[in-house]
């Protein structure tokens, strides 16, 4: 047993060693924030390549400047694959993936395997915080028994909290420090220690009554967005059939100063959270005999968008007297959103696969993704095509899937034979531009 005040004071005095487990789009910015305010930080990851790059002062995420990594390294940050060093840490913040399996059900293997790897090295006085997006009950059902397996009692010897990550890669308006941090603890003592951990690094910490409430908060945030995007994607289809520009309509509706929040249609949902989180809740709800029909319907609409874009591409080619089979198609933007290199759950990749499955010859251009990376479910041996007049002329059609600012939209409009615009970038009508 340890006095909770002693643990709290260690964080308030910034004498604690912060362990970040999982050094990706969530863990790396968090590491940089704690390092910047004077904490010693140890990064832990199973990926040797990532660890070696970080220890060499290099970065593998485009929107994080390499100079920041080099500065952190010079001021004491270290990365390792050695989980035995967990015992050195006063805080362990878990930032690992929570994807879906092939049945569209939660894949908790990363969380469970990581916690199992930590177990032998947990000790009195530590706080364990899970940040991965997950279903309500994960912290209590999966982490709690594992943390206590060696005899430590949560709330007395060791502290357990859930604080969902809210990173938005590439967003220039918000950073780790300025995004409020929701947190729930397994006990009041856990919450007290968790607040002490995060209030050093985050401007505003928002405590809630339990880890379940914190887990549900994250799901509500993202399901709210997914459902509203599903709504506007469905309205896009109706508006298109009626000859109405949905982007014009959304912009006009957004002038109402109350009761309306603008959401814009696109080729489908991307990123690690928005396309996945609804399935976490629908899966857990079934345990309680409930069916989340509204959420599931919006998911069906969003999942159908790549097929909708494909249909628009085929229509455009048919109008030009061509079939998709044998046509050369350039997909513009394969990251899941503009101005980043993050390809997690990108609908662009599904569009590429659909084009290929129909016999089209697919290529891509993305200034943020020079080479198609290794992905768990998708595989293309491709590099980004230069966006030049000569190159655009080689393709029978281009599909604007992600509207990066670095694209030359006037060049695309002038040189492409057919443009399928899934992002509403081209508002003025043109014979060779099809809105999708």
From Swiss-Prot:
Residues at which NAD(+) binds: 13-34
Alphabetical UniProt keywords: Cell wall biogenesis/degradation, Lipopolysaccharide biosynthesis, Membrane, NAD, Oxidoreductase, Transmembrane, Transmembrane helix
SMART domains named in the record: UDPG_MGDP_dh_C
Enzyme Commission no: 1.1.1.136
Top-level class of the enzyme under EC nomenclature: oxidoreductase
Pfam families found in the cross-reference section: UDPG_MGDP_dh (PF00984), UDPG_MGDP_dh_C (PF03720), UDPG_MGDP_dh_N (PF03721)
Main location: membrane
Gene Ontology cellular component annotations, sorted alphabetically: membrane
Cofactor note: A monovalent cation. NH4(+) and K(+) are the most effective.
Transmembrane segments: 13-32
Protein topology in the membrane: Single-pass membrane protein
Temperature dependency: Optimum temperature is 33-37 degrees Celsius. Active from temperatures ranging from 0 degrees Celsius to 65 degrees Celsius.
pH effect summary: Optimum pH is 8.0-9.0.
InterPro entries listed in its UniProt record: 6-PGluconate_DH-like_C_sf, NAD(P)-bd_dom_sf, UDP-Glc/GDP-Man, UDP-Glc/GDP-Man_DH_C, UDP-Glc/GDP-Man_DH_C_sf, UDP-Glc/GDP-Man_DH_dimer, UDP-Glc/GDP-Man_DH_N, UDP_ManNAc/GlcNAc_DH
Cofactor: K(+); NH4(+)
Role according to the record: Plays a role in the biosynthesis of B-band O antigen for serotype O5.
Sequence similarity: Belongs to the UDP-glucose/GDP-mannose dehydrogenase family.
Protein name per UniProt: UDP-N-acetyl-D-glucosamine 6-dehydrogenase
Species of provenance: Pseudomonas aeruginosa (strain ATCC 15692 / DSM 22644 / CIP 104116 / JCM 14847 / LMG 12228 / 1C / PRS 101 / PAO1)
Gene field: wbpA
């Amino acid at each position: 047993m340890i006095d909770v005040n002693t643990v709290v004071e260690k964080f308030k005095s910034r004498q604690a060693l912060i362990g970040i487990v999982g050094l990706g789009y969530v863990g790396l910015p968090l590491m940089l924030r704690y390092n910047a305010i004077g904490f010693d930080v140890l990064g832990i990851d199973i990926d040797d390549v990532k660890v070696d790059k970080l220890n060499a002062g290099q970065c593998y995420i485009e929107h994080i400047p390499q100079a920041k990594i080099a500065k952190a390294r010079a001021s004491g940050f270290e990365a390792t694959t050695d989980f035995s060093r967990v015992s050195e840490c006063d805080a362990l913040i878990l930032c690992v993936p929570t994807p879906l399996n092939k049945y569209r059900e939660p894949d908790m293997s990363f969380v469970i395997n990581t916690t199992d790897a930590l177990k032998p090295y947990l000790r009195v006085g530590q706080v364990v915080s899970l940040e991965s997006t997950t279903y309500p009950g994960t912290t209590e059902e999966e982490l709690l028994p594992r943390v206590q397996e060696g005899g430590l009692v949560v709330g007395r010897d060791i502290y357990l909290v859930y604080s969902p990550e809210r990173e938005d890669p590439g967003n220039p308006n918000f950073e780790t420090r300025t995004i409020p941090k929701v947190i729930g603890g397994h006990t009041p003592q856990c919450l007290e220690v968790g607040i002490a951990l995060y209030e050093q690094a985050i401007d505003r910490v928002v405590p809630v009554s339990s880890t379940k409430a914190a887990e549900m908060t994250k799901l509500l945030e993202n399901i709210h967005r997914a459902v509203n995007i599903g709504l506007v994607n469905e309205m896009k289809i109706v508006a298109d059939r009626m000859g109405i520009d949905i982007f014009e309509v959304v912009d006009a509706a957004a002038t109402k100063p109350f009761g309306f929040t603008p959401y814009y249609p696109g080729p489908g949902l991307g990123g690690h959270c928005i396309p996945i989180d609804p399935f976490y809740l629908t899966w857990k709800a079934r345990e309680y005999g409930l069916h989340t029909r509204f959420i599931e319907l919006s998911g069906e609409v969003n999942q159908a968008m790549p097929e909708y874009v494909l249909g628009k591409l085929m229509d455009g080619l048919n109008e030009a007297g061509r079939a998709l089979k044998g046509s050369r198609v350039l997909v513009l933007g394969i990251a899941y959103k503009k101005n980043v290199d993050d390809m997690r759950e990108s609908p662009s990749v599904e569009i590429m696969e659909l084009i290929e499955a129909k016999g089209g010859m697919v290529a891509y251009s993305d200034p943020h993704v020079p080479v198609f990376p290794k992905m768990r479910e998708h595989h293309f041996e491709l590099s980004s095509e230069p966006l030049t007049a000569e190159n655009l002329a080689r393709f029978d059609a281009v599909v604007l899937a992600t509207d990066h600012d670095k694209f030359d939209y006037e060049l695309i409009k002038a040189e492409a034979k057919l443009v399928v615009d899934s992002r509403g970038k081209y508002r003025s009508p043109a014979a060779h531009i099809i809105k999708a």
